[in-house]
Amino acid sequence: MYKLIINGGIALNGHVKTAGSKNSSLPILFASILANGPITLTNTPHLSDVSTTLRLLMDMGAEFILESDNSLFIDSSNLTNLVAQYNLVKTMRASILALGPMLAKYCKAKISLPGGCAIGSRPVNLHLKALEDLGAFIKVENGYIYATAKKLIGTEIHFDQISVTATENIIMAATLATGITTIYNAAQEPEIVDLINCLIKMGAKISGAGTSIITIEGVDELSGVTYAVCPDRIEAGTYLVAATITGGKITIKNVCYQSMRAILVKLLETGADIKTEKNSITLDMKGKRPKAVNIKTSTYPNFPTDMQAQFTALNAIADGYSTITETIFENRFMHIPELSRMGASLVLEGNTVVCKGVKSLTGAYLMATDLRASASLVLAGLAAIGTTTIERVYHLDRGYEMIEEKLKLLGAQIERVQD
């Protein structure tokens, strides 16, 4: 077990390069099941969730080579074990994304009910109902999803609520289905667009990417390709908040600012100066104390739930009062007690946190609970007076590539040590 030790109060300055998107890499890796040949991915992030996905695919019969330049060669074209075991699935919610591709290509799958961050129920019923609409026979028994199909048949899918992973699963399943599938109330996240772009390059026929209505015309087969994963907008947003909360100036490279408009608007409201270029964002807080900003999470293109915890930490030391409302997950405020231990003035009322900004936080001994909550504690530690120790940082490794090394490049005093 590792922990992070942070000596806070240092303004961050410099340049940092974001990794490829975690939320693009995982579905694209599962999409490799659909291909009749190998896939090469570039800009692949080195994350524990990526490693778990690769172990899961390898357990099914895939082969892969991970290069030092963040390129990944994977051949999932001939799986021999159509079972996603609990010991691998339990740590990662995205493992449900194996279901659609396996059903589409092999007409059967056995998937353990998934795990991942403990931030709400995140039901899989949307996935299962939609797959049944496509012609699958599904039962859930002893913690496993058993799915079979003679052949998936295109149809209209109407999601009762917007779900990123359900949208991705059904898109992948429909690529090899017979006929046309139309998904209504589809999620519009950039990572879904990235998945669709990869599938189209593989030979899929898909229209409507980035809209709420996506149409897929099934094809007989998909081919292997070389594809570059898009930059991680949540990692980029987290480092921009790090500069804002410490009063620093940083430039983020390998970033697509067009996908981050909702985040950038809120950072501008804090008083930060922001300059965007083709592949970079520069934020300058000029040593100022940030202004408090109200946050309400929603589906893309609105403010992302994956940035809520980071902005809660920012508001904790901002000038003024703010509210942070979470509309996506019902249990995504587990960072509140930890921030309060540092001196933050936070009151949780239902799905809203009322925050009165304090001038400074004090370093404390903290316990990470999930991926983005962990990031918020790191941000708070960077801004705090004194030393902050954060336990259970394996949560961070699920979504941030070498976070302490990148923060060191910006001047942070942060170390990873083993218990």
UniProtKB/Swiss-Prot annotation:
It catalyses: phosphoenolpyruvate + UDP-N-acetyl-alpha-D-glucosamine = UDP-N-acetyl-3-O-(1-carboxyvinyl)-alpha-D-glucosamine + phosphate. It is an enzyme of class 2 (transferase). Phosphoenolpyruvate binds at residues 22-23. Pathway: Cell wall biogenesis; peptidoglycan biosynthesis. UDP-N-acetyl-alpha-D-glucosamine binds at residues 93, 306, 328. The active site is at residue 117. Its EC number is 2.5.1.7. Keywords: Cell cycle, Cell division, Cell shape, Cell wall biogenesis/degradation, Cytoplasm, Peptidoglycan synthesis, Pyruvate, Transferase. It is found in: Cytoplasm. It comes from the Bacteria. GO terms for biological process: cell division; cell wall organization; peptidoglycan biosynthetic process; regulation of cell shape; UDP-N-acetylgalactosamine biosynthetic process. One of its GO terms (cellular component) is cytoplasm. GO terms for molecular function: UDP-N-acetylglucosamine 1-carboxyvinyltransferase activity. It holds the Pfam family EPSP_synthase. The modification 2-(S-cysteinyl)pyruvic acid O-phosphothioketal is found at residue 117. CDD domains: UdpNAET. Cell wall formation. Adds enolpyruvyl to UDP-N-acetylglucosamine. PANTHER family: UDP-N-ACETYLGLUCOSAMINE 1-CARBOXYVINYLTRANSFERASE. NCBIfam families: murA, PRK09369.1. Belongs to the EPSP synthase family. MurA subfamily. HAMAP family: MurA. This is UDP-N-acetylglucosamine 1-carboxyvinyltransferase. The gene is murA.
